[in-house]
């Protein structure tokens, strides 16, 4: 069963907090990974952690479009619905 958006948001925020060392309470869907000074390696670690957490694989063509918390949620939702 697919999770709802708020459950996905909570997990994405936890992952971003762990990987990037930021306060989860400061993150919103509008937060971009540039806002968090995430470089390309950080982004790769974020995606890998999300794939592990949600037990899915985000297609390579979606990786470049994941620039914010909302983008990450949408990528996860689209893979879950596929």
Positions of predicted regions on the chain:
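Thiotemplate assembly-line natural product biosynthesis machinery
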Residues: 2-24, 79-82
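Phosphopantetheine carrier-protein modules
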Residues: 18-35, 55-65
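Phosphopantetheine-attachment site and its flanking helix in carrier
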Residues: 34-52
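C-terminal structural segments of small proteins and small subunits
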Residues: 57, 64-81
């Amino acid at each position: 069963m697919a999770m709802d958006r708020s459950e996905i948001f909570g997990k994405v925020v936890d992952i971003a907090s762990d990987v990037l060392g930021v306060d989860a309470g400061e993150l919103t869907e509008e937060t971009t990974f540039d806002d968090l000074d995430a470089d390309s390696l950080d982004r790769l670690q974020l995606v890998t952690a999300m794939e592990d957490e949600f037990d899915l694989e985000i297609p390579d063509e979606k990786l470049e479009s994941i620039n914010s918390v909302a983008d990450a949620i949408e990528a996860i939702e689209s893979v879950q619905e596929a």
